[in-house]
Amino acid sequence: ERIVIAGPSGSGKSTLIRCINRLEEHQRGQIIVDGTELSSDLKNIDKIRSEVGMVFQHFNLFPHLTILENCTLAPIWVRKTPKKEAEETAMHFLEKVKIPEQALKYPGQLSGGQQQRVAIARSLCMRPRIMLFDEPTSALDPEMIKEVLDTMIELAEEGMTMLCVTHEMGFARQVANRVIFMDEGQIVEQNEPEEFFNNPKSERTKLFLSQILGH
């Protein structure tokens, strides 16, 4: 399933998505990820985190490590993958996001769009079952947005389970099975993209769409 979470700033979108791998702690209710309940049990948290990849608004790459080292760090330390195997996997995913030639460079030598594609490749190196994207294009120059969205569309077409917080409504229309609209910490409306965009039920959703699609 590919879910897009939309809503105005401060509506709780990023907090919701960060709860799914315990970067934020939920106060009530249950979060169950692939059959494992996210509780205060550290074993459960580690298990879920190892299966949930996350790509942030700001790329969060280690500036003192090469692109290849950024991609192999977690598999080597967390999954205990042999270095050679980790490097082969990293090159596979760097090719997938179309920047294998950048492997030996440092993050500061890459454009924002390239760094975000590295961040996606780095997450994929852990072979996650679910990918979380927290406004992955909002810090990018307009001409770099397409290259990141193209990578995400390709992932979606290959069947990756994805939750994506984004204002890119064209991406939501093209890729999502379901669009969730949040406001003031609540899910106001959720529906299939066609129904969500063409026939929104809530007045708050209608206002949001008129503002974001009117530009």
What are these regions (language model features)?
Residues 1-193:
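ABC family nucleotide-binding domain
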Residues 190, 194-215:
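C-terminal boundary and immediately downstream tail of ABC-type ATPase nucleotide-binding domains
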